[in-house]
């Protein structure tokens, strides 16, 4: 291993910075480009602001979705399992 100049900061040591700039590609090679690419692309960790997802609202003029449901009988027997007492 080559000796490193002790006067250099650790982020300026030779080999500490990649030769090419980071890009937005998510291929395997670019995910391992540098530590920052690995954390953001490979692991998917991002400490930026979260974007608020807007809810989809129905149009204001459309009242078709506000129609009341028709009354239905409360007791309906279905299948072979009656809910009443056995005779």
From Swiss-Prot:
Superkingdom in the source lineage: Viruses
Any one GO molecular function term: regulatory region RNA binding
Record site feature (Essential for Tat translocation through the endosomal membrane), residues: 11
Binding site for Zn(2+) 1: 22, 33-34, 37
Record InterPro entries: IV_Tat, Tat_dom_sf
Single Gene Ontology BP annotation: symbiont-mediated suppression of host type I interferon-mediated signaling pathway
Binding residues annotated for Zn(2+) 2, in chain numbering: 25, 27, 30
CC annotations in GO: extracellular region; host cell cytoplasm; host cell nucleolus
Comp. bias regions, Basic and acidic residues: 77-87
Residue numbers carrying Asymmetric dimethylarginine: 52-53
Biased composition (Basic residues): 48-58
Protein name: Protein Tat
Organism: Human immunodeficiency virus type 1 group M subtype A (isolate MAL) (HIV-1)
Lineage: Viruses, Riboviria, Pararnavirae, Artverviricota, Revtraviricetes
Primary gene name: tat
């Amino acid at each position: 291993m080559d000796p490193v100049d002790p006067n250099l900061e650790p982020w300026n040591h030779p080999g500490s910075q990649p030769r090419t700039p980071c890009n937005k590609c998510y291929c395997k090679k670019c995910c391992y480009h540098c530590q920052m690419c690995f954390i953001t692309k490979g692991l998917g960790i991002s400490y930026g602001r979260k974007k608020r997802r807007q809810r989809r609202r129905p149009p204001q003029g459309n009242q078709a979705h506000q129609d009341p449901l028709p009354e239905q009988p409360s007791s309906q027997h279905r299948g072979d399992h009656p809910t009443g007492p056995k005779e």
